[in-house]
């Protein structure tokens, strides 16, 4: 992880996102108990610490929890990672169904919070924004229904001075759609992509994307 992170930085990126809790892949008992073993937890801490040591203090490290954890586990993980490695956000700390649980998490964590890839309309995001449940939102241009709805979500977030970071899990077209939105809203933050998939992305395009 540390070596891969250094390569990302050397390629020109200023932010790295990862899920360090390998025990939860592929999703383990996510919707059953939401917990992680002490061994798996410590492995996650060690991975993020190694990445931080490798890339230094000027690179943002973002953590994606994939909604895998229950409330006390998410609070514990996010606070430890923020205190030890100064993470830039803890994303999807809980399954997305309960805004009340998200509020409880928000009140107990020190880390910045990012949510939104599994919220689908501006009305979903309105509740998050009105109740100060996140520092960043991550709408998905595919799952929100397209560029028009995502632009409306971005404009709504702008009223609350909340940055947006378009979620990307669908490939080259989604990256280009997210970039299109990012060029037209003032509260654009980062555009997600996976370095392992770049070759595959470019096979769908007439002109390759320069990701730096």
Residue ranges with predicted function:
Residues 1-108:
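Metal-dependent enolase-superfamily TIM-barrel catalytic cores that perform enediolate-based chemistry
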Residues 79, 86, 95-212:
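Shared catalytic-loop signature of beta/alpha-barrel
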């Amino acid at each position: 992880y540390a070596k891969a992170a250094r390569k990302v930085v050397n390629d020109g990126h200023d932010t790295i996102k990862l899920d360090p809790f390998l025990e939860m892949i592929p999703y383990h008992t996510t919707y059953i108990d939401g917990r992680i073993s002490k061994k798996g937890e410590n492995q996650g801490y060690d991975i993020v610490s190694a990445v931080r040591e490798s890339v230094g203090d000027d690179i943002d490290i973002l953590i994606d929890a994939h909604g895998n954890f229950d409330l006390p586990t998410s609070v514990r993980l996010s606070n430890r990672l923020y205190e030890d490695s100064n993470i830039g956000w803890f994303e999807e700390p809980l399954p997305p169904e309960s805004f009340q649980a998200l509020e409880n998490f928000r009140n107990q964590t020190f880390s910045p919070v990012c949510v939104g890839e599994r919220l689908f309309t501006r009305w979903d995001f309105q509740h998050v924004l009105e109740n100060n449940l996140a520092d960043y939102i991550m709408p998905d241009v595919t799952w929100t229904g397209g560029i028009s709805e995502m632009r409306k979500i971005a404009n709504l977030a702008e009223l609350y001075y909340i940055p947006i970071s378009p979620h990307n899990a669908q490939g080259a077209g989604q990256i280009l759609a997210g970039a299109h939105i990012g060029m037209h809203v003032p509260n654009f933050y980062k555009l997600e992509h996976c370095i392992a998939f770049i070759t595959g992305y470019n096979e769908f395009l007439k002109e390759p994307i320069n990701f730096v």
